[in-house]
Amino acid sequence: MEKTRKLNRIAIQEGRCAVLQGSVTDMAFEDSRFDAATAFETVYFWPDLPRCFREIWRTLKPGGTILICNESNGDTDKDERWTQIIGGMTIYKDIELKTCLEQAGFHEVQIRKKKRWLCVTARK
């Protein structure tokens, strides 16, 4: 949290940014509040992926976008070594993320891969 506050100091001072800590499973925001949501290297650790995507869907405005970006895309056995080193980590393949997003109500799911990286976008 401290590093985030430091990196965003000016935006915070100008009232353009707020740094809050919470859980993606139960966010304390009203429905349809945000235009976009991002998840960089975090979905690996979410406890209940479908529930988390439903919660993000709830907080996005109609037409809002979610962007997920992961360094490990699950396409090789090398990715699994991380799950043995880091407790509680799950590496999802593109089809798993797409399925969970669609089940949560998202559409226009787009998948982009480059080397071992995976980026997924979807709209509410």
Write out the residue ranges for each language-model feature.
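Class I SAM-dependent methyltransferase SAM/SAH-binding core
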Residues: M1-D26
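A short glycine-rich, Lys/Arg-flanked "PGG" loop and its adjoining helix->strand segment in the class I
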Residues: P50-P62
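Conserved beta-strand signature within the Rossmann-like core of class I S-adenosyl-L-methionine
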Residues: G63-N70
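Core SAM-dependent methyltransferase catalytic element
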Residues: A104-K124
